[in-house]
Every structure is written in C-alpha cells, then in structure tokens.
C-alpha cells in the first residue's frame, strides 16, 4: 500500500495544502467522470481492479503527518483540498485546526443549501474544529454529570438542566451546519457517536413537552451523556472498539452458556421443585379444644413411613378434611403460613429448612417438616418455576453467595445432591466463565496485533519518504555546489541546518522568522528538526539552564571530594547496607500492634527517626556525588527523594491531627527492594505496563460504573426511601442502598466484585422485580464478565516476553550480587588461610588470590568500576550476535575458541557487568542463563541437578516401580552391562565407600554372592507389576480406613478394633515394602528419588505411632498430633498414577515462580496490612449486650471505660471483631478475606463504623474508609490474584517449550497439512447398515435415514423440553392435566420413532449407542407413566432422563454451518477433558487429605456461623462437602469463625462431648488459620487457575483448528457421504459414479457439476475395474482446498502407510492408470480414429473420382458393379454417423472391460459427451497429444481443448 501511494503524493511540504475552491470541486467532478469511464472499460474487458484503501495516516481525527511541515497560519480552519489520493475523485475536503488535527467533510451542500463556500458553513466549521469548543463541551458534560449525582437536587437545578439541553442543541446544530445531516459520507448521522447525542437531545425535548408518565425512568437516559466523554478523549474510542469486538465474539459463548444454563435449570426444576419451601413447623398445634386423638395418633404423624412420604402434605384429599377440622376452629392454611410457627435459627431471617430423606436436614423436637410459607430470601431463591431455577443456576455459575444456595438445597433435598453442584461448578462455573475470559483475551490480542501492524506500516511509509527526501536533498546540494563552481560564487546554504560530524542535525543555530518556502528542502529539514526535538523531552534553553544550575563543578578540591563520595556511595557494600536498612525499617513498621506498651512504642519511633536519618543521608550524599542533574536522571532516585521528603514532612507534622495517613507513605520504601529483587521489579513493571493500557480501560470502567450508579439512584433511590420497611425491621436504610450516589456507587462496585444477588434481592423487594433484574444483570454481564475480563486479558498480554526481560538501566542492579559475591570470597579467603595454618604452611597472599580468583567481581584494587563504564548500555545488535554464538556453542556447532559470553557464563558470579535475567516463570535450573529465551531450549545446567532428576522426569519414578530406570548411567554403557536392564545398582555412593571401606562387598564369591542373589531376587519382586498393583491397593485401603475415624468411632467398637488391627497390618506391609526397596535399589538410588523420600517420611510417621502404642504413650499430645500426619498417606498414590504425576510435575515446575509471585504479593499486601494496622488497630472493639447480641448506641455507651462500668450486670461485654487489624498477621487474614470477597462485609462494616481506639463504634461514621477497601480490591485483589493466572499460564508455555512442542520446527504451511493429515488418518469408511430388501421396510429405511427426520425429531425433543419448562410448583389441576396429555403425545411420538427405526434397521438398531439410549428413555417413560407414584417416591423422577436427550443436539449441530463457533467451544471442552480430569483427581486428593486433617482437628468445635448440624468436620462426608464449598473460596470465613474461638466466654473448654472422652468445643486459631489459608491457596489459586490455563490453551488450539480450511467434520461428512456410494465398505468407488459423489459432498470438499474436466485434472489413480480408492479422492480434494505444496507427497506416503496399517483388509492396491491418463488415452484414440477416417474418406474419394473418370472414359461400361462397390465403401465410411452413439457406448463398454494400458485403436466415433472436448471433424487435426507415458503439465484443460 505504501509504495503505491508514494508516487501519487504531491511533493510534501506546506505548499501542497491548497485551499478548496470551486475549481477544485469541478476538477473532482471531472476526475470522478473519468474514473467511472475507466471502470466501465475495465469491466467490459474483465480486468480486475486492485482494491484501493484510504491512507491510514491521513484518517479523520489523526494529526497531519510531519512530512507536510508546519501548515502556515492562513490555511488553518480553511477548507483545503484532500491530501489522500483515495479521495481524489470523491467530493470531500479537509480542514486543519491549530493542533494540526485533520477533519474531513463532504463537499456536497449541507442540509441541501450550504455549499462548502457559504459563509455560514465556514463559520460553523471554524467553531466545530476549535479546541476551545470541544473543551467547553467536555466541561459541560462533566458539570452535567456532577448535577446528575445529586439525590435530591435543589429547585434551581431545573433551570440548569435547560441550560445543558441548550448547549447540547447548539453543539448538534453546529455539527449539522458544518457537516450536513445524513445524506453523504462524513455527515452528522454517519458517525454512530452522534446517534447518542441525537437521541439524548430528542429525549430531553420529548420528556419536556409530552407527558409520558414515569419521568424518572426517562430522565435516566440523560446519563448516557456521560458516554460523550468517550468521543472527546481519543484513546477511549479504541478500548470501546475492543469491548464491542469482544462482545461480538462473545455471542457464541453466550448462546452456549444460556443453553447449558437452561438444561441445568431444567434439571434443577425437576429435582428440587418446591423443596425450598419445606420448613420446620411447630407440631402438634398448641391448642386445647382440638380433638386430641386427631393429632395425637402416633401411627399417623409419628410414623416414619408416613412422614417420609413426600406426597402426604401436598395431598388434596387430606386437605379436604378441613371442614371437619374447622368445627374445632382450627384454620390449617393460616397456621401453616404463620411465620410464628416456624423454627428460626438465631440471627437468620429465614426459617430453618428441612427434608424428608435420611440425609437431609432434620427438625428439632416438637417440630415437623412441612411445605409451608414462602421460599427463602424474600421468596426469590427457589426452583419452583423455570425462570427462578435459571436465576439460581446463573448465580451458581457466577459463584455469588452460592454456598447459601448449596446449603439450602442440600438441607432440603439431601447430601447426595452434592453431585449436581459438583457438575455445575466444574462445567458451568469453571468452564463457561473462563471461556468468556478466553474469548475476551483473544479479541483483545487480535485488536492489539492490528494496531501494532498499522503502526509498523506507518513507520515503513515514513522511512521510505525520508529516504526519498534525503536523496532529493543531496541532489539539491550537488546542484548548488555545481552552480557555485560554475558561477564562482559561494553556495550559501541554510546556516541553521549544518550537519555535524555525526550526521545528525545540529539545531543550535538561531532560527530566522519562518518564511513561506516552496522548496521541498526546507520542509524536509523542518520535519527532521521536529523529529530531533521530539526525541528531546525539553526545549533547548532548558538544557542550558540546567547545565549551569544543576551541575556543581566549582573548584578542584570539591571535584575530588565529590569523587571520593561517589566511590563510597556507589560501593556495593553501601547498597547492601541500605537494602538491609529497608528490610529492617519494614520490620519495624510491621511490629506495630495493639495493645502496645509505651516502651515498645518509643523503640519504634526512635527506630523510625534513625531510618529516616539514614535514608536522608543517603539521598544527600548521592546528590553531592552525582549532581542533581545526574541524580534526577534515574527513576529510582526520584522515587527515593520523594519518599525521603515525605518522611521529613511527616516528622514536621507529626502532632497535627488527621495526618497519620502520611505515615503510610513510608511503606513505599518497601518498593526500593525492587532495585535488587528482579521479580518484584518485573511485577511492578508489568503493573506499570498494564496501567498504561489500563488507564483507558479504567476510564471506561469508571464511566460505566458512573452511569449505572446514576441509573440506579434515579430509578430506585426513591423506592429505597419509601419501601424501606420491607427489608429492614427498624425501617432505617440498610448499608447497601441506592438512595444517594455514594451508596449507589458502592453497590455497583460490589456487583463488579461479583456480589450481586443479595443487593438484588433487596432491590427487587423495594422496587419491583423486572427493573432490578434488568439493571443488575446488565452491570454483571457488561461490567464483571466483559470489562473485568478485559482487565485480565491486558494483564496476561503484559506477561509477554518483553516485560519479562529484567531492566538493564542501571549497573546498580547487580550491586547486591557483587556485595554478596565479595562476602563469599572473603569467607573463602579466611577458610583457605586458616586451613593453610592448620596444615602448617603459611600461604602467601598471592597464592590464595590465585586459588580463589578475583573477589566478587571487583576491579583490580577492589573498587567498583568507574561510573561512566557502569552506565554504558550494552550494545544491542552485538548482543544478538553473541547470543546466537552462545547457542551455537552450546550445541557444539561453532568450532574454535569459546565465545566470551560462554566464559562469562562459567565465571558467573564474578562478572559485575552481567545483568541476571530472572524470568517470572523461571525454569527449574538454579543458574539462569545470561541470555533470554533462546537458550531455554538448550538449558545447560540440567546436569547440575541430576540427583533430583526423577521429579522432573515425566516417566521415571523409582518409587512407582512400574517404570523404574536406574538413573545416572549412560544408556550405551547400561546396554552393555545388563542387556535386560534387570540388575540392581550400587548400594552406596562412591564417597561413602571411600570413607568406610567396610561397605565394599565383593559379589563374586562367598557371602557377597549370596547377598547379590538376594538383592536380585528383591529387585525382581519389586519390579513386578503385581507388586506395584498390590501396593497401590494397600495405599488406597489404608487411606480409605482413615475416612472412618470420625466422631462416632468411639461408639462403633467393632469398626474401631478392625481399624486398629488394619493400621498395624498396613504399617507392617509398608515397612516391608520399604526394606525390600532398600535391598533391591540400594540406598543411593532410593534416597536420590524425591517420591521415595515422600514414602519414607510417611512410613516413619506410622512407625513412630506404632512404637508409641507399644510403649503406651498413645495418649501423649505430640504423638496425637503426629497421628494426624497419617492424613498424608494418600500422597503416596501420587507417584503411582500417571495422570496425577503429570499434573504434579507441571506444578512442581511452576512452584519456584508461584512462590516468587506469592512473595511479591505478600510484600504488596504487607503495605496494605501495615496501613490497615495504622488505620484500624484497636478500633474494632465494641460494647455488646450479650442477651440480645445487639451493639449499644454511643449515646448509651461511648467508650471502653463506660462499657466496663456496666459489666457488673454480667450481660455486657467489651469484645473485638474476630478478624481485625490489631497486628500485621491478622491484617493479612483480613486482607485475604477481602480479596476472596468472603467475610469482607463484617470487616468493612467494622472499619466504616470505627472511631478511635477504645471508643464505641458508630454507624457509618467513617464512611470514606470504604475507599481503602476499594483501592485494595483493585490493586491487591484484581491485580495480584490475576498475576497468579498469568504466571501459571506463562509457566505452562515455558514447560511446553522445554519438553519440546513438536510444532516448533514446522512452518505454518506444514502445520496446516500436518493437522489435516492427522485428522485424515484416524478415519476409515464404515460399513453402512444395509438397506432392507423388503419394499415397505426399504421405504421406511429411506425415511428414517434422511437428515430431515433427524432434525425434526430434534425439534420435537426441544419442544418436549419447553413443555417441561412450563411446569411450576403450584400449578392448577387443569394445567397438570394438559401437560400430562402433551407429555403422552410426546411419549407416543418418541415410541413411534423407536418402533420405526427398529422396523427399518432391524437388529442393526442396537449397534448404535444413541439408539440404545433412546430405547431406554422410551421404556422408562412408559414405565414411568404406569408407576409414576412409586418411582417418584423411591427413585429419581423419570422426567430427568428426557433432559439427557438434549445431548443429541450436539449431533445436529454438525449439519448447521452457522454453529461452527459453538462447536469450536465444545471441541475445546473435549480437548481439555483429559487434562481437567487429571486436575480434578489431584484436587480430590488434596480435599481428601484436608478432610482427614479437618476431622482430626475440628470435629468438636462449637456449632455457630458456618458450622452446624449438616456442615461440619464430624464425619468424612461432611468434611468433603465443606471442602468442596471452599474450593471456590466460598463460605470459608463462616467455617473459620468458630475455630477462632480459643476460650471462654466464646466457647467452653470443659464441655462434655457425649460418646467420647474428648472435652471442650474450642478451636485452635493458629491451626485453623493455617489450614484454611493453605487450602485456599492450593485449591483456589493453583488448581483452579490451572483449570483456567488449560482452558485458555485449548480454546486457542481449538480456534486455530476451526479456522483451518479443513476440520474434523469435513472428513466425517466425506465418509458419511462415502457410505452411501460404497455400501459394502470396499473403500473403492466406480469411476463412472465419481462425478455424482463429489457433487453430493458438503463444502469445502464439494466440486459441483459440471465437474468432468475438474475431475480429470485431479489425476486420480485407478485400479483394475476402473475403481478409485477413497483415500486418493480425499487426498486430491484436500490438495484442491489447501493448494499444492511440496510437503504433500511425503505426507501422503506416510498417511498411506498409516492407513494400510489400520486397514489390513485393504484390497491389493496397484493402480494401473489415472483419470488423466485415461482421458489422454481416450483423446488419443479419438484422434487416431478421426485421422484414420479422414484417410479412408480421402482414399474413397480418390477411388470414386478414379472410378468416375474411368467410367467416363469407358462410357459407362461396367458401371453398375462399380456403383455397388462405391456405395458399399461410402456406406462403410458414413453410415456409422447414424449409429454414432450406439457404437460409442458399446466401444466404451469394451474399453471398460479391457485392462490394456496401451492406447486403444478400435475405430469408434466420438460420443456426444466428448464433443465439448473434440473439434468438429472438418477442422484440421489438432496438435497431437503427448505420447504415452509422458506426463501432462498442470494446465491439462488447455492442452485437451
């Protein structure tokens, strides 16, 4: 594009900006006519037009490119001719404003009357493009926004409103006058952003003059004005573009999500309909005058069988007895619906739910389980209708407060239904939600690439132009010089632009006044000058001034002094010292806590003074040493000085109230660590990089939040005020409401955090369901799912390799390493010296120096390298060469001496100038290569970590003996020594044998030989597969045994005894296994394998507890806690299961980087934690009335002392919130709760209510403390938690690179072929079900196998689902009957389908899985009809099976071309399944271990908050349920709360637990906190994020696959069509049927008729009998789609081999000819025929004429016989024309039967079908076709014709 547009450029420079005149317009019209004529000509001659595009750098809105120079003032704001060649024949003109921005207008009259030359339009244009105009509009919008945030605006705001409307109207009028309304391009309504303005203004006028009822709803439309900011700020448009793109891309995911949710909701509806209304109702009713026998009859209500029957309480016949009961004035309905009769738990708003199955919740004494009252949460949580079920499942999928739904459902329906939730969380939540992330990330990446490509293009264009201009300039110079020589005068060039020796422009000369120059030269030099200046940040005078003021070189002694100080300040040791000070300072700040002694407080404040002094001194010294000019050139120094200044200011203002926040700024010093901690540095960089891009996104997010907050306030604010009594018992506004803007903003922010359901219930209760659902779900989908995922996408994209390169700006980066290197060197020096002394020889200093090498990278005299050397950046390109060299060296490809960089690598610590790159996802090597990723593939330090090899080796695990390979031996050696690989290794390492020679055993004789035989026997046993299987079985059994040790074990004596014995048996077996392995493998191998170490430690635990039992110490505390470590037993299973081991190895590879990020996150959080301690320590205490659990008002109790004075009553307590900020540790816990959004509400409420230390809190007195949490959530939660995902994904990619992705060495082209072929090879033609011989059966068969039949059945299935969706819990009898009848119809239809298929397909019906499934469903449906009551009572409702039928939709999707996107998503899921299964297994293992641990530690804690009778750690099942809940971090705060009770009055340590001898119900806070935090980090952050990583990865792969021209389905469709043409699955097809076959195929393989010629050109090989093989056809068609390529043949060969191997039954496949040869043969034959015919004709004509002449001469003598002869001959020649076709077809048949490869010579005429190819007989013979055996070039068609 660039090159094409260059020649058409007018030589740039300001002079080419020509005013737009009527002549210009006429010229445009002239050009347009010429262009039209040219196009017409081209069209007639069928010449293709290259597509023309507008130039990207001259788009409207962009700035005028530099090449055009500075436009002179007279062209500013004036219509100019368009510069873009694209518009040369279109009626447009441009206008430039002062900022050189381009505005493009249409040159047609605006509003039909204002031509481009009219005064009015010119004025309007001037106003429109003026910077002040847009500024004014922007300010108006912002002011308007401020007015919109007022919850109750003053009376005069109406007038202001009119003003705003006036301004917007004026703006639109200006635009219309300048641009025109909507007819041509560049008019007002052609810009979608103007639609927004137009609609807003129209709405304003409509609402003003027409009364439309609900004004506030319409007024909310004004909020959209805030969107106008997007039009004014340039960067925002692109982000919004990306957003809109991603929303478009999301359509498929949305459809899939809605579909899956509908299916799940349907299942939920069928399973749990009406369950959530089951409550505990007081029973029997407390009445005196009722007939006692009526309710006291035991058999009637107390009987389990009765109350286990669901149908009883809904039974109409029973209710019909009301009339009888009402005699005794008992109103059943009222009783059942009176909330006073329900059982409520303390502090809950909803009655306790219960269920009638054995594993559901039970009611307390005196209550019965009945269906009564409304559903929980104002009646909004239920499965009673499809829509509520859908909402419940959407909530489950977005994981908002789902633990509540989970607990309610399990309580009402039973714990078995946990499976339902597992499926939905894993499929719905993890998969679908992350697909949304994957799609958004991809859309963003694509958008990004496009932008980059555009920039690249511009850059290239610009470079080309500069080249041209330079040449031009040189030519001018030459011309001038020549002139000067000729004329003898001076060539007086332009003085300001003399070039200095470096070839750069010297801009120091004074500029004259700008003269309007017409030479291109000045434009170029101006442009160049601008470029130069653009590279300098400040104007030149600033540099002069800075040199004078900021560089202090006054006198020689001072300079010397400066140099000394520089040496001191820059010394690595000083750096080390400063770093230590930073760490100590951070520690001091982290030691603050509450309550703190005065002495400790003093120590801390003195410490702070000292550190402030040290840092100030460092800054002052650096300023002296480096001069302010140099000092402030470095970012770190600016940062330092900022913090030091703040610290000093804070000291000065220490006693001013309210400025304690300044103390928090000291915390930023922590970030100075980044200087010497590469990972931290890099993470800060990543965040910095993202913040740039995120700046715009954050603005968009802010605009969205603002709009929704205002909308919420306008729509619902009033309702909250008026209907507040519905949601608050004391009729005061709750904390979360929308009455004012700030609270409305908080609600929207909370929705962005993913918590929308609770606030939505409130909203629905006060303001109606429809509006609230709409607004909340819009915020949820737009804000949370799209914008926040875009956030994540940005972060992930910042993880690109560029940001991972650690910064090399300053040499100081390594100062720490240098210092540490020196210290190591010093220690080594001392060691060597002392050893020398001990050995009695005193080494000279020189010797020691020689033996140790240089001290840690210092120069000769131990000083650090001089400053200038240090700062010099490494040469960029040179580096690259060195890098390549380095790689070659590693692989051994370069000979000659080692490259210097290699030596550097070896002399690693000693090189001070080396920047060490520590990528975030570092490889596992301890030493990083000095080069970046290029060397990763050849990572050298592998051998350094040999001993631990098995851990990282995917297959070898000694302890999983199945694949034991003795390590550390060369494969060749090994092969020589023991051919079977079945000999044990050495027992001990060489070092051991050297130290203790007694360990050496001679195995060739005597005892040694016996020992060797024993070892070999053990080795054989251990290596045997059965042994391995047995051990795995034992591990599983012993792990399973642990699950029985719950709180009931004491009561189950038999089980307990069995377990005790089993435990001993297991221990003995494992000890035996360990001893066997010691003997078999030897200590050396056993103890160098990490998996064996794991086994060893776990067996040790068992041994210790066994010994303790023998000695009778089993009740000792330490022994008991050791016993809990038995929970680790299942870990031994890890090494035995391949799938899990793969995942664990991947995880272990990621651990270093995960730890790195975890550390950095901790540092990040430390800042917020210390800040929290500063803000809230000791302020969360409150005074509470223990009887009512209510907090006293501050009017009653104001502070701690007042509270303590009331304590004598015993009902008052001064207590703290359990999770608080009293010290940094608790601060961390609080932050974790806030970051996972669990339990964060209580912490936030406490913070917002807090006043001062030891003062009673007051409601929302400290409202803006919410902002602390908002900021933390953005930086601490969004950023840092998402970094985990980034790291894990990055790591996955690194590991893939390391373990050799095979695709790395393939070109894109090759990959395409490779993939197509991969798919191709896996398929082969199936034998179709034969068509029945019977006529009727045959007809039915045809009907049943049609696609239409399938699709119509599918539609019926969907309709059946719809009728199931219509069901509700409280439907009328009529509806029940109608649905029953409809259901009957469906059952009959599906039964009919079943019968028809069985009739047509006969016994083959049962060979297809889907058919069997259908059959079972039909049978179940019929049985279900007959026995519905019975089945519903004891089994799952049979309607459920119908839901599974929906899976058949997947089959129909193939037939719909448009559903490709959805199929891609499903394909991604299928690809991820194996990996996800492995991760699921690992997750289960972790859950298992933790639940065993939880049972042994928390079984007896007090039941409160999240722990109750169903959700607890008492039994294994309950523990698993609790842990599954926490896997998504849901509800962990509730489970942790009771465990934080450490003593009275929170819990009772002496409480008796019946049935056991364990006392107390207190928890252990430290164990509890470790337990939950570690579980959350492992499961939530690591395992769940691995899920995300895999899905992202596979989604990308699947998208690539689906975007390939040929996908799996195309091949499947090919074979499906093939089956119809080859019913016997011979894999061959007749050549005659080929044309029909390729015509019936689906796109893209299809070749539509007429396709004869096309098929001939495909050159397909044929076997005897004129048959063609399926693979050949498929290859040819694939080639046709993908285009030809050199790799094709090789691939084809491998594919054929594969196919032969897969199908040994294949017929001997020896092609004898090809379609092309066959055609050539036919053509040859026809030509020979024709030639021969002509020859005959000519002969007979000759003969005839001869005869004629002869007869003339002979006077007719003998004519008759000759006539006969002649007639005969003529007939022979021409008679055949009549039976042309007959002969031809016969000839063809004969030819078909011949198997001769040579050309046929029988004489037949051409067939009609070939006439197209053969010229009519009279024409001269065509050039002969090539002889046999010679190939024809690709253009066969031409040669044939």
Curated annotation (Swiss-Prot):
It comes from the Eukaryota. III repeats lie at residues 1007-1320. Disulfide bonds join 280-354, 363-369, 725-731, 763-772, 1183-1203, 1547-1562. It is found in: Cell membrane. Glycans are attached at residues 214, 288, 291, 297, 303, 315, 327, 356, 1185, 1199. The record marks 401 as: Important for inhibition by tetrodotoxin. PROSITE patterns: IQ. Residues 1-131, 179-192, 234-252, 439-572, 623-636, 677-692, 792-1026, 1077-1090, 1137-1153, 1286-1348, 1397-1408, 1457-1475, 1592-1841 are cytoplasmic. The keyword Membrane applies. IV repeats lie at residues 1329-1627. Residues 386-410, 741-761, 1225-1246, 1516-1538 dip into the membrane without crossing it. GO terms for biological process: regulation of skeletal muscle contraction by action potential; sodium ion transport. It catalyses: Na(+)(in) = Na(+)(out). Detected in quadriceps muscle (at protein level). Detected in hind-limb skeletal muscles, but not in heart or brain. Detected at low levels in the myocardium. According to Pubme=26427606 detected also in brain. Residues 32-60, 867-887, 1776-1794 have a biased composition (Basic and acidic residues). Residues 151-157, 211-216, 273-385, 411-417, 592-602, 657-658, 712-740, 762-772, 1045-1057, 1110-1117, 1174-1224, 1247-1263, 1367-1377, 1427-1439, 1494-1515, 1539-1568 are extracellular. It is a multi-pass membrane protein. II repeats lie at residues 554-826. The chain crosses the membrane at residues 132-150, 158-178, 193-210, 217-233, 253-272, 418-438, 573-591, 603-622, 637-656, 659-676, 693-711, 773-791, 1027-1044, 1058-1076, 1091-1109, 1118-1136, 1154-1173, 1264-1285, 1349-1366, 1378-1396, 1409-1426, 1440-1456, 1476-1493, 1569-1591. GO terms for cellular component: plasma membrane; voltage-gated sodium channel complex. The channel is inhibited by tetrodotoxin. GO terms for molecular function: voltage-gated sodium channel activity. Pore-forming subunit of Nav1.4, a voltage-gated sodium (Nav) channel that directly mediates the depolarizing phase of action potentials in excitable membranes. Navs, also called VGSCs (voltage-gated sodium channels) or VDSCs (voltage-dependent sodium channels), operate by switching between closed and open conformations depending on the voltage difference across the membrane. In the open conformation they allow Na(+) ions to selectively pass through the pore, along their electrochemical gradient. Belongs to the sodium channel (TC 1.A.1.10) family. Nav1.4/SCN4A subfamily. The Nav1.4 voltage-gated sodium channel consists of an ion-conducting alpha subunit SCN4A which is functional on its own and a regulatory beta subunit SCN1B. SCN1B strongly enhances the presence of SCN4A at the cell surface. SCN1B is also required for rapid channel inactivation and recovery after inactivation. It prevents the decrease of channel activity in response to repetitive, high-frequency depolarizations. This is Sodium channel protein type 4 subunit alpha. The lineage of its organism: Eukaryota, Metazoa, Chordata, Craniata, Vertebrata. The gene is Scn4a.
